[in-house]
UniProtKB/Swiss-Prot annotation:
It comes from Lutra lutra (European river otter). The gene is HBB. Coiled coil: none annotated. The lineage of its organism: Eukaryota, Metazoa, Chordata, Craniata, Vertebrata. One of its GO terms (biological process) is hydrogen peroxide catabolic process. GO terms for molecular function: haptoglobin binding; heme binding; hemoglobin alpha binding; metal ion binding; organic acid binding; oxygen binding; oxygen carrier activity; peroxidase activity. Residues 2-146 form the Globin domain. The modification N-acetylvaline is found at residue 1. InterPro entries: Globin, Globin-like_sf, Globin/Proto, Hemoglobin_b, Hemoglobin_oxygen_transport. The modification S-nitrosocysteine is found at residue 93. Involved in oxygen transport from the lung to the various peripheral tissues. Heme b binds at residues 63, 92. This is Hemoglobin subunit beta. GO terms for cellular component: blood microparticle; haptoglobin-hemoglobin complex; hemoglobin complex.
Length: 146
């Protein structure tokens, strides 16, 4: 991902204020509610029968935290996202058979959740920088697909 120094500073500054537990669960939960076909990858998560069930599901929250912890690693390695996410790309491609389009959807949902949490602090410039990052992460996660 090619970010200016200003964009990198904006992304890392805001990310330092993110509650990974809360935002991760909310982002994954919203993905599963807004794009219900993504639920098929989470059969083992139990009750996903309604928006309230999804948003309150402890397995959704735990996996959302895991996802955002991986995203945090990506932010530390913006110049090598493909390398950072190589193993996760392989896992999601070869073993889990996740549609790589879902990575883009989750990235966009994450941007919406960040905007909701940070309000005026999430300026158009910050959003533009985050859109670049989530697109780069989605591309890195889709890298092993053929």
């Amino acid at each position: 991902v090619h970010l200016t120094g200003e964009e990198k500073a904006a992304v890392t500054s805001l990310w330092g204020k993110v509650n990974v537990d809360e935002v991760g669960g909310e982002a994954l939960g919203r993905l599963l509610v807004v794009y219900p076909w993504t639920q098929r990858f989470f059969d083992s998560f139990g009750d996903l029968s309604s928006p309230d069930a999804v948003m309150g599901n402890p397995k959704v929250k735990a996996h959302g935290k895991k996802v955002l912890n991986s995203f945090s690693e990506g932010l530390k390695n913006l110049d090598n996202l493909k390398g950072t996410f190589a193993k996760l790309s392989e896992l999601h491609c070869d073993k889990l058979h996740v549609d790589p389009e879902n990575f883009k959807l989750l990235g966009n949902v994450l941007v919406c959740v960040l905007a909701h949490h940070f309000g005026k602090e999430f300026t158009p410039q910050v959003q533009a920088a985050y859109q670049k990052v989530v697109a780069g992460v989605a591309n890195a996660l889709a890298h092993k697909y053929h």
